[in-house]
Amino acid sequence: MRIGFFTDTYTPQINGVVTSICLFKQALIERGHEVYVFAPTPEHADDDERTVRFHSLPFVFQPEMRLASPFSMEALRVLDAVDLDIVHSHDPFAIGLFGLNVARRHKIPYVHTYHTLYPEYVHYVWETRLTQKLAERLSREFCEQCSSIIAPSTKVERYLRSWGVTVPIDIIATGVDTERYSTVNPTRMAALAEKAGLKPKERALLFMGRLGKEKNVELLLRAVWHSHLPNIRLLVGGDGPHRVYLESLAAELGISDRVSFMGYLQGEDAVAAYHLADAFAFASTTETQGLVIGEAMAAGLPVISVEDHAVEDFVINGRTGLVTPGRAEDLAAAFDELLGDEPRRAAFAMAAQSRAASFSIERQAERLEHHYEHAIATHRPRRIFPRLALPGRRT
């Protein structure tokens, strides 16, 4: 198949959506498909001739994000030369909507992965109940224009149905490169331990992700403060707009000597961070799938998390990790319980790594391939937003 990925979020950005796109792109290529990516154009050189960049500007509220032009002559030139079989969008914004029009003009299926629960992120613009309801309505109206939706978790599928989405939804989580996370470079691991100030007898918890308000890292800091373990350390791998606040909070709580902010970690450094830790700590309730949880489990880490539907697809409470109510005291008790019992922690670690195999990128890419095949076989052209239509043939 010739597949077009249309996304407003792509490299060099670092987030779960980009990780998902890159993993599926490579896995689909390895399965013999051609994958074209249409994405914003920050200062970044691509080594792939099948990546087409749209002009873009930094988003005023989050400079690392991009606002793309809704039109590209270069994209049209490529699309004229390439007969796509299917359009797969990863954002409902400028480039995603461009892809919607491409699908309409070429009368091919338009599949969309609903990566982000947008009503949970309106605080970056203007947080009110009205804006949340508006985000729900716009999400529903957009999804209703699609041939089908891919939900990365049962949580997302439930939300979409509750908002009134009626098109077919298939639950396909982003796969994990289990082979990559199962082995580690000892030299890189030792260097990262030194950078983090991790002492030999310390018990390390790891959080990996963007440091935004919605990730709830504040709760992890407060849980460390409540912990009774004298040798506990929280490793924070990531960066973002909330970092300065979190560093000041750690100082205010008097735990700066037990928290290591390591910035964004990529490649072997990210793998090394997972292998440095004894458990993975997670407190976000806005995730659509918690991709980092799968990565942690693939590296052999048990997970300690607050209750959330996105977590339940990965973590089996009492077997691959501990799931607690969303209070700092409860998280702290779970930290102490698991990190204070090494035989139990080791058993959880083995079970976690075994379970991660069921979420391998190879298995998930096969499921995505089947989704595409079904979408193509059953496709009937759908009417899209008239105001978004580009000049072209009518459906």
PLM feature spans:
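Aromatic "clamp/platform" in nucleotide-sugar-dependent glycosyltransferases that forms part
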Residues: 285
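Conserved donor-binding/catalytic core segment of Leloir-type glycosyltransferases
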Residues: 193, 198-224
